[in-house]
């Protein structure tokens, strides 16, 4: 079974979000199950030179794009036992950021066509082409509409994964006509047309043999208007080929027993070492070293989606409690400035790191007691899974993957691995935070809760089995 992942980002090459984590970890887990997965992505200038140096030039081809033929170098390399192909074209990929350029429609039209034009030259018989998010959605659409009659492609099945429905790749009709050479028959509501523009993600949904969302709850949510980003009707129409498979975490990267980034390695039976990480975290940020004061942390993009309006509304009420708060992330200036002001107002209780620091993030996960993630919506979420693996108890809103992975603590049965609330309401969140703090001070209960969180399986194994089953069903 041969699978080709077409992605716009992938760990360890480049990362802007959770898509890169999935693209980096899932193929390794699938390989353990006997599935041969190879990955194709752009050769961005942002990829570390040492990783590019590990690749060799496999072949040079031309990619037809509108009236032009564009250069396409196919670089080939291996990382952690997985074969990668990097699509080389400096005009499109020698940029200072992955996305957000005036010509993104052209860049990813080129990449989509390049993926398809490369397939006969990869020395790899592709059974299933698995595309991800808007950037590669048109790979599946073009395969069905333009390449399916070619013997090199006619047997290939397609899977399309929605990581975040909010970003759809909406461009002017000229992208469809001039670059992809698709005619008027594709510019209507049953095809690519979307409020006067063309929508790449819509193409992926329409044309793929199977669609997955990154959690079962998100799969249901996106079929409703509130979460559907104007594609809910289309997703209801194609419900029969839509499924939800929750993400995992790469346990070779996120494992408190082996993590080289944290001060003291530990497991569920050596929680005293977790306290050593807490002290180290307090020292790093210059917080008072109080073992009995819970640290509430957030490692997040500072955006509206992450529920920061709720946090902002009741933050001072949380500060009335004996707590410490650590924020690590960057994003919208209004939230950055708010948390910086709170750090100024509560210097003994609040510390903020604007930006991202991988090593520090691991220490925050290991040294915190509670992890706050009150998202407005959350397709899957990795933060809560990492927190759980490190015995840092999540407080989440019941949406998307948060609902699928965090079970609210039940004091009657002792079951659960975190705390959750349903409504997008600041005082519901505050009540849940206060409830979590109350249980934190009940040490026997808390230690049991932490052990329950740490002993569950958050790896990719179950998810990889589900994907393997999906691929197999397409080939039968």
Swiss-Prot record:
Could you tell me the keywords of this UniProt record?
A: Glycogen biosynthesis, Glycosyltransferase, Transferase
> Which InterPro entries is this protein grouped with?
Glyco_trans_1, GS/SS, Starch_synth_cat_dom
Q: Which Gene3D superfamilies match?
A: Glycogen Phosphorylase B
Q: What is its EC number?
A: 2.4.1.21
Which reaction does this chain catalyze?
[(1->4)-alpha-D-glucosyl](n) + ADP-alpha-D-glucose = [(1->4)-alpha-D-glucosyl](n+1) + ADP + H(+)
Citing just one GO molecular function, the answer is: alpha-1,4-glucan glucosyltransferase (UDP-glucose donor) activity
Kindly state a single biological-process term from the GO annotations of this entry: glycogen biosynthetic process
Pathway this chain belongs to: Glycan biosynthesis; glycogen biosynthesis
The source's superkingdom equals Bacteria
Does the keyword section mention Transferase? yes
Please tell me where ADP-alpha-D-glucose binds in this chain: 15
- Keyword Transferase in annotation: yes
Which Pfam family, just one, is annotated for this protein?
Glyco_transf_5
Question: Which PANTHER family does the record match to this protein?
Answer: ALPHA AMYLASE DOMAIN-CONTAINING PROTEIN (PTHR45825:SF11), GRANULE-BOUND STARCH SYNTHASE 1, CHLOROPLASTIC/AMYLOPLASTIC (PTHR45825)
Q: What does this protein do?
A: Synthesizes alpha-1,4-glucan chains using ADP-glucose.
Similarity field? Belongs to the glycosyltransferase 1 family. Bacterial/plant glycogen synthase subfamily.
NCBIfam families xref list: glgA (TIGR02095), PRK00654.1-1 (NF001898), PRK00654.1-2 (NF001899)
| HAMAP family in the record | Glycogen_synth
Q: What is this protein called?
A: Glycogen synthase
Lineage, opening ranks: Bacteria, Bacillati, Bacillota, Bacilli, Bacillales
The gene from which this protein is expressed is: glgA
């Amino acid at each position: 079974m041969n699978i080709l992942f077409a992605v716009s980002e992938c760990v360890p090459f480049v990362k802007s979000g959770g898509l890169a984590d999935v693209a980096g970890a899932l193929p390794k887990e699938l390989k353990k199950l006997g599935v041969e997965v190879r990955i194709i992505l752009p050769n961005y200038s942002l990829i570390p030179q040492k990783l590019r140096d590990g690749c060799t030039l496999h072949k040079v081809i031309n990619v037809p794009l509108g009236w032009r033929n564009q250069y396409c170098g196919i670089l080939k390399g291996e990382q952690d036992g997985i074969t990668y192909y990097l699509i080389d074209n400096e005009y499109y990929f020698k940029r200072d950021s992955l996305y957000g350029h005036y010509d993104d429609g052209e860049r990813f039209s080129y990449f989509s066509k390049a993926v398809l034009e490369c397939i006969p030259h990869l020395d790899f018989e592709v059974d299933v082409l698995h595309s991800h998010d808007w950037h590669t959605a048109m790979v599946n659409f073009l395969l069905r509409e333009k390449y399916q009659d070619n013997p090199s492609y006619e047997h290939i099945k397609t899977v399309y994964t929605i990581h975040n429905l909010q970003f759809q790749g909406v461009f002017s009709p000229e992208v469809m006509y001039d670059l992809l050479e698709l005619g008027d028959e594709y510019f209507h509501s049953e095809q690519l047309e979307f409020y006067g523009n063309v929508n790449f993600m819509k193409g992926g949904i329409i044309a793929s043999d199977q669609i997955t969302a990154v959690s079962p709850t998100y799969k249901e949510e996106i079929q409703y208007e509130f979460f559907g980003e104007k594609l809910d009707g289309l997703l209801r129409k194609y419900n029969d080929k839509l499924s939800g498979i929750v993400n995992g975490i790469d346990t070779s990267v996120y494992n408190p027993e082996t993590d080289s980034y944290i001060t003291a390695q530990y497991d569920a039976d050596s929680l005293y070492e977790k306290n050593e990480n807490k002290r180290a975290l307090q020292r790093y940020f210059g917080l008072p070293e109080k073992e009995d004061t819970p640290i509430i942390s957030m490692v997040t993009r500072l955006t509206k989606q992450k529920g920061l309006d709720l946090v902002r509304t009741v933050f001072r009420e949380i500060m009335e409690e004996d707590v410490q708060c650590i924020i690590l992330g960057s994003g919208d200036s209004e939230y950055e400035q708010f948390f910086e002001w709170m750090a100024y107002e509560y210097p003994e209780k609040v510390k903020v790191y604007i930006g991202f620091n991988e090593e520090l993030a691991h220490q925050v996960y290991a040294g915190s007691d509670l992890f706050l993630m009150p998202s407005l919506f959350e397709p899957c979420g990795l933060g809560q899974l990492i927190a759980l693996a490190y015995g840092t108890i999540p407080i989440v809103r019941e949406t998307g993957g948060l609902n699928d992975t965090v079970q609210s603590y039940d004091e009657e049965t002792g079951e659960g691995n975190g705390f959750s609330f349903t409504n997008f309401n600041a005082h519901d969140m505050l009540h849940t935070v206060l409830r979590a703090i109350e249980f934190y001070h009940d040490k026997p209960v808390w230690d049991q809760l932490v052990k329950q969180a740490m002993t569950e399986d958050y790896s990719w194994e179950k998810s990889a089995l589900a994907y393997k089953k999906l691929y197999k069903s397409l080939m039968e």
